[in-house]
């Protein structure tokens, strides 16, 4: 491999005033944004400038680099110049997970886990995709096992890379009522309904998805799945990026 053909290891973080400059590219799923680089990736790709609010809801690749840049920018210290490329999609996932976003009467169904000290955290119902399954079939099975609800899969709203996992999240229309605890496979968790408006302040994994679900519920669901890396390790601090 020569320097001319070696994949780039860094990208340029460029700003035009207070807007992030990105390249607009396309793949089979449609448009996405990428950090400019000096490699052969997309010669002549047009550039666009996004505000922070626009960038938070854009599909920016690679997702790991986007997470680092958006976090720093949202916290008031946007990086500039060369940054390392971090692409979690480049390696095979250690596990593929499917999660069901079920909303009923203004509340979202979550699994609550209570620690020994009384503190709680929450997860979106779902689990691993088994051999022979698709994420769509797995999410229906997992919803039934963890809550007793029957589900009809709607659009995929987010893809999250976390701790080596590739997680798919779907809007799911569910019927029935949550089953008795002794019939559910939740690994010690309890299904609960949480008002959607409380999600930004709820200690929910994945953290970067919590406030987005509340935002999308108010403003409309994304036409294509959001692509997010999530390296957050603590649920206490607020996350708006």
Per-region residue spans from a language model:
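Hydrophobic, helix-prone linear segments
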Residues: 1-30, 64, 203-221, 240
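Conserved Nudix-box catalytic region and its N-terminal flanking loop in Nudix hydrolases
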Residues: 16, 20-45, 103-145
